[in-house]
Amino acid sequence: MSSCVERYVRGWMTDDLDMILTACADDFVYDDPIDGRFNKAEFADYFRGLGEVEIAWSEAVQEADGKETFWMWWTWKPKGAAESSLGAALVKAGPDGVHSEKVASYKH
């Protein structure tokens, strides 16, 4: 697993926005089917409003072109909500950082 992927995952696990952003490539896009798409510049505001997030992740798969793909599973409890949401995310990364994360909710 590349250092940018490790940093990205560690950032989510420790609720460290700066760590997440430094792991992202300039063209980073976070795609949430409920809340919309956020580029790297917009992501900080989105992240600050998330509430409590817990993640687990799988090993990264190295692709032929040198990029990495991995899955993250998450539990999210929005601020002020009584129940948590569950979901997964597909993350794509290259040598220059994480390029995208596309999330899907199982329960919302």
For each feature predicted by the language model, list its residue ranges.
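Amphipathic alpha-helical repeat elements characteristic of tetratricopeptide repeat
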Residues: 2-3
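Short, solvent-exposed secondary-structure junction/capping segments
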Residues: 6-10, 22-35
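A structural signal for alpha-helix termini and helix-coil/disorder junctions
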Residues: 11-14, 49
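Short helix-adjacent coil turns
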Residues: 15-19
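A beta-strand edge to alpha-helix "cap/lid" segment located at domain peripheries
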Residues: 41-108
